[in-house]
Design a protein with these regions (language model features):
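Domain-length accessory/inserted modules outside core catalytic folds
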Residues: 1-29, 37-115
Length: 115
């Protein structure tokens, strides 16, 4: 996962209405993975994907954003389990779990031409 995606995902978690126990419904709220997909689509990492009626990303979408299935299931379980300050807010524990996800930094390797 790159830093830009992580930052946009965190920003959206603080402003998006949360959907719990149900599949994503754009009008009432989004689940944690739908917010991730929305952020990734905005950054053109994945094509716009309709999360209506589902709450998990496909293997291809996960690979594109750099997230494992295990991380997705962990975050999805937290989305449904933890209580926030309001019924449609994402809990701080969940936001902090996203904040703690590892970021893949590009390697800056100096290549020396063969002399």
């Amino acid at each position: 996962m790159n830093q830009n995606l992580k930052e946009l995902w965190l920003k959206k978690l603080n402003t998006t209405k949360r959907q719990r126990y149900n599949l994503s419904d754009g009008d009432k709220g989004l689940c944690i993975m739908a917010v991730a997909a929305e952020a990734a689509a905005e950054l053109h990492i994945i094509p716009d994907c309709d999360m209506q009626g589902r709450d998990l990303l496909t293997d291809e979408e996960l690979k594109a954003i750099g997230l494992s299935q295990e991380a997705q299931f962990y975050l999805s379980t937290m989305n449904d389990t933890y209580v926030a300050t309001g019924p449609d807010k994402f809990p701080m524990r969940l936001i902090n779990a996203v904040r703690d996800l590892p970021v893949k930094e590009p390697l800056l390797i100096e290549v020396k031409p063969n002399a």
